[in-house]
Amino acid sequence: MIYEGKAITVKALESGIVELNFDLKGESVNKFNRLTLNELRQAVDAIKADASVKGVIVSSGKDVFIVGADITEFVDNFKLPEAELVAGNLQANRIFSDFEDLGVPTVVAINGIALGGGLEMCLAADYRVISSSARIGLPEVKLGLYPGFGGTVRLPRIIGADNAIEWIASGKESSAEDALKVGAVDAVVAPEKLQAAALDLIQRAISGEFDYKAKRQPKLDKLKLNAIEQMMAFETAKGFVAGQAGPNYPAPVEAIKTIQKAANFGRDKALEIEAAGFVKMAKTSAAQSLIGLFLNDQELKKKAKGYDAVAKDVKQAAVLGAGIMGGGIAYQSAVKGTPILMKDIREEAIQLGLNEASKLLGGRLEKGRLTAAKMAEALNAIRPTLSYGDFGNVDLVVEAVVENPKVKQAVLAEVEANVGEHTILASNTSTISISLLAKALKRPENFVGMHFFNPVHMMPLVEVIRGEKSSEEAVATTVAYARKMGKNPIVVNDCPGFLVNRVLFPYFGGFARLVSAGVDFVRIDKVMEKFGWPMGPAYLMDVVGIDTGHHGRDVMAEGFPDRMKDDRRSVVDALYEAKRLGQKNGKGFYAYETDKKGKPKKVNDPAVLDVLKPIVYEQREVSDEDIINWMMIPLCLETVRCLEDGIVETAAEADMGLIYGIGFPPFRGGALRYIDSIGVAEFVALADQYAELGALYQPTAKLREMASKGQSFFGQASSEE
């Protein structure tokens, strides 16, 4: 054994060939943490010191190659001063460069996923052989960063600037075949032939059949583009990528600028340019929020997986209420492998549900995400029915009938009488109390809420609502079923609106106040979209449905009359009474026309101004900043209340619920991280400036206490530098 550590071993294979193997003890995957980097330094030094070494094969002892850097270390690392961070980055890069500069040929055998630093390790080798099932990529832009272990330097010199820009700026993974096409790898082989192929390649390089030094040289030189080619490649790409990424996600454009700045330099100087730019990105609030988001997401998944120990396996599901929502739920269950009954009392509703499922499956087939055989299998897994005849062996029933407590209670009581005594019943409700609905049931312990978001196939979140009498098994089984459906479940306690809608309606309340103060809703939409929301509040209400918003607002006003009840007629009342219900009937705040793809396209409709005139009670001058604060303060404060009231258990779950459920701007990290980024004390002072607007703008006593103690929700303050 030439070197033995906890993450890396180097052993002799045959005839001077050694294998550097990544196998991080106690972990299911390999990653570049401090330990792995330190051991790579020692391993490279040990190889360099051994005169008998003629060639190096790099491999992995895990199912994956290396998934990248250990992101849990980023939070503390990125707090370091800029100069210290740059020095640390260059020190790490020296390891990869020393590996690249070994006086013998190097081959990496990529057996599974190689992402971020994992791929950058591969790029430092002379040759790359990849398993046909492996995938590679540089996803750092998704964290508000770009590659920092030489990715912006080596990749353009291996696959060309255009291809490298596409890989780095998109952050997408590539298949083995796609990687071969652009020259990122040298050979694709069947998984079982990978080791033999790597051995064959290294032997041919040692024998001189392949010139490894000539292969290595372009990575050490400047980029082979003249001034005109550089201008065409970089300026065009910057414009295109800036348009796609938008101003709130600077990393993709900064990555292109870095490749451009380093184009006329050799490797070592180019790495210095990369390090400076990488650290600049690491210090942005976008990176800190997106890294926080990634860690929150990991925490969420780990927590949801923790319910598996108590959960029953759902082998057969059912959905009550077909139509678009029922069809969407049936599709999601079937396509992920759980057969489902779809029941309704009307044949036409069942047909609508089946059409929805068929349309969604057809869409996947067209995009090549599904084979015709798999589509047929999924369709066969959805069984339509008008009766309860087959409900005896159902493990879990999702009730998805109209959002009316009396109707839901009647349907739930009826289905309870037709299922086994251990069957879980789950109500897909957006606002109605689960404990209230449970009063109609004989076995309330088997009952929970399971709130899907529309459209079901696209929205990743499912709120699993624990009622007063819900058993742990019922909650756990529903969480496990949601995960099986490919969703991200968050368990919340019962209250009107649960987490997401309870927080969303104060946001809509801020919007209604602005319109009543004479602010143009089109302007509000533009300001909030610029702030980072995927759509402004008026457009969002049109998509949700004005009737749905009207009903939800009444439920919330009844649940929280102290702050959510408004005796004045509002913008929602005006549109509802004028039967302008949004996209569903072609007119709401906006009018809707059908585009070439058959999708609704919004257009301004002057007729709406007459509808809104009676609810404009004053004409206020408000700045864009005021618009943001009128909208965001109530949303953030209600999120704080949900955490304090125990509706949601952790700050991470609260923030992820808003990002997954209502499209909260990811680069801002969620409502609580947004408060942290402003500073809790500063946020409280800001809210106090708007105190005249009512109870929704009043910070809680506990938040004031946090402000006075200098506390934060995530134990750190994120600030733009």
Curated annotation (Swiss-Prot):
Active site residues according to the UniProt entry: H451 (for 3-hydroxyacyl-coa dehydrogenase activity)
Feature type site, description Important for catalytic activity: E120, E140
One GO biological process term: fatty acid beta-oxidation
SUPFAM superfamilies per the UniProt record, alphabetical: 6-phosphogluconate dehydrogenase C-terminal domain-like (SSF48179), ClpP/crotonase (SSF52096), NAD(P)-binding Rossmann-fold domains (SSF51735)
GO molecular function terms attached to this record: 3-hydroxybutyryl-CoA epimerase activity; delta(3)-delta(2)-enoyl-CoA isomerase activity; enoyl-CoA hydratase activity; long-chain-3-hydroxyacyl-CoA dehydrogenase activity; NAD+ binding
Reaction it catalyzes: a (3S)-3-hydroxyacyl-CoA + NAD(+) = a 3-oxoacyl-CoA + NADH + H(+); a (3S)-3-hydroxyacyl-CoA = a (2E)-enoyl-CoA + H2O; a 4-saturated-(3S)-3-hydroxyacyl-CoA = a (3E)-enoyl-CoA + H2O; (3S)-3-hydroxybutanoyl-CoA = (3R)-3-hydroxybutanoyl-CoA
Full protein name: Fatty acid oxidation complex subunit alpha
Lineage of the species this protein comes from: Bacteria, Pseudomonadati, Pseudomonadota, Gammaproteobacteria, Pseudomonadales
Gene (UniProt): fadB
